[in-house]
């Protein structure tokens, strides 16, 4: 199985969300790269743009010895698909989790209004964010993984504006590498998962029972098993 895996985190969290997967993949001998996106984690305070987000993934993949398997969660999944659609270099595969709905402008603008209101709270929404995380992810260890690298409170407006430039069906249709779409059965953002699957050239849809939007943390063991199986399938298909 050894090779490289790039793990791209979601909105407002950071590379810390991947602790469980990093430990599992490292134990199997993989090189694991977990970049922080602009405005998140160690890059808190930077402005987020779609171009800089894509460049972050490109730099992470370039730094890793091949074959490289790319994984993205939510925001990271949208960015990974967008990047892979334009990427001339071969990758082993891509797993896009919890990004099963096209980010239409109307939806994004509604979220921007809501995010703006929350940002007016005295703590800019930190308490609300952490309360929601701990309510959705009952295991305190995994809930802490979400927030351990810092909570990106100031990046919402930039991200929701920039996501207008992502066209998931178009992106998925242009990716030659195998694609896995992984969603929790309780995820509210999987409305178009079948359309997205139909758009892929070589795609697999996996639903993890009982998992919410934060699938890799709500069901970490099950998610990691799916991820390892996906990586192994690409390794076995690669000519010696």
Task: List PLM regions with ranges.
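Flexible "cap/lid" loop of the alpha/beta hydrolase fold
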Residues: 85-86, 91-122
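Gly/Ala-rich beta-loop-alpha elbow adjacent to hydrolase catalytic centers
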Residues: 72-76, 80
């Amino acid at each position: 199985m050894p090779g490289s895996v790039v793990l791209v985190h979601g909105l407002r969290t950071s590379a810390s969300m991947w602790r469980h997967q990093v430990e599992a993949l490292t134990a199997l001998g993989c090189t694991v790269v977990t970049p922080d996106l602009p405005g998140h984690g160690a890059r808190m305070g930077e402005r987020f743009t779609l171009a800089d987000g894509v460049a972050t993934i490109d730099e992470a993949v370039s730094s890793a010895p091949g074959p490289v398997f790319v994984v993205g969660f939510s925001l990271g999944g949208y960015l990974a698909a967008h990047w892979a659609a334009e990427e001339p270099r071969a990758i082993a595969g891509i797993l896009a989790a919890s990004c099963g709905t096209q980010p239409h402008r109307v939806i994004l603008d509604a979220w921007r209004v809501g995010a703006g209101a929350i940002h007016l709270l005295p703590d800019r929404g930190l308490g609300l964010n952490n309360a929601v995380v701990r309510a959705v992810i009952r295991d305190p260890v995994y809930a802490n993984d979400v927030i351990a690298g810092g909570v990106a409170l100031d990046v919402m407006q930039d991200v929701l504006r920039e996501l207008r430039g992502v066209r998931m069906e178009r992106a998925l249709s242009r990716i030659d590498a195998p694609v896995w779409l992984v969603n929790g059965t309780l995820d509210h953002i999987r409305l178009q998962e079948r359309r997205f699957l139909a758009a892929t050239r070589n795609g697999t849809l996996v639903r993890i029972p009982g998992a919410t939007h934060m699938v890799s943390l709500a069901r970490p063991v099950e998610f990691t098993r799916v991820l390892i199986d996906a990586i192994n399938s690409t390794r076995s298909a690669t000519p010696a």
